[in-house]
């Protein structure tokens, strides 16, 4: 059976929604840019001491801007570029390849009905999110 990307994407969206999984993608480059801009502006206004103050203020602002931007994992999965979706599906397919399914609904039922399989799918999804996307996972509302 060829890898059916749409079915696996729907499975991942269902499983992550069922687990109430959210993630935040680390935007460290944006935070670093804000910190650098703060240091630069501080240096222009206050000289060498201004660099320290501006860097501290910019760093705090950068940290604040990049923290707590949690999005539901189904939304993140749907927004992935096709190449990353394919890579994620390949990872999950290694887990579900022995199953025989005809559509996404049947695949979801097969996985959700088997706790061991469901745990493996969730673990692979978390692994992909944390390793490939450098995401931080959160459960619940």
From Swiss-Prot:
Q: Which family does it belong to?
A: Belongs to the C19orf12 family.
Its source organism is Xenopus tropicalis
Q: Where in the cell is it found?
A: Mitochondrion; Mitochondrion membrane; Endoplasmic reticulum; Cytoplasm, Cytosol
Entry keyword set: Cytoplasm, Endoplasmic reticulum, Membrane, Mitochondrion, Transmembrane, Transmembrane helix
Tell me which InterPro entries the record gives.
C19orf12
Please give the name of this protein: Protein C19orf12 homolog
TM segment ranges: 33-53
* Keyword rRNA-binding among UniProt keywords: no
Write one Pfam family the protein is assigned to.
Answer: C19orf12
Q: What membrane topology is given?
A: Single-pass membrane protein
Question: Is this entry keyworded Transcription?
Answer: no
Pull one GO CC term from this UniProt entry. mitochondrion
């Amino acid at each position: 059976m060829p890898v059916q990307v749409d079915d696996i994407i729907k499975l991942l969206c269902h499983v992550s929604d069922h687990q109430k999984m959210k993630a935040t993608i680390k935007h460290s480059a944006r935070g670093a840019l804000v910190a650098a801009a703060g240091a630069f502006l501080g240096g222009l206004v206050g000289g060498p001491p201004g660099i320290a103050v501006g860097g501290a203020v910019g760093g705090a602002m950068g940290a604040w801007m990049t923290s707590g931007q949690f999005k539901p994992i189904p939304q993140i999965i749907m927004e992935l570029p096709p190449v990353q979706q394919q890579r994620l599906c390949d990872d999950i397919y290694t887990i579900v390849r022995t199953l025989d399914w005809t559509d996404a609904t049947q695949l979801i039922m097969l996985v959700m009905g088997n706790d061991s399989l469901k745990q493996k799918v969730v673990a692979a999804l978390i692994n992909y999110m944390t390793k490939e996307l450098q995401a931080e996972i959160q459960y619940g509302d």
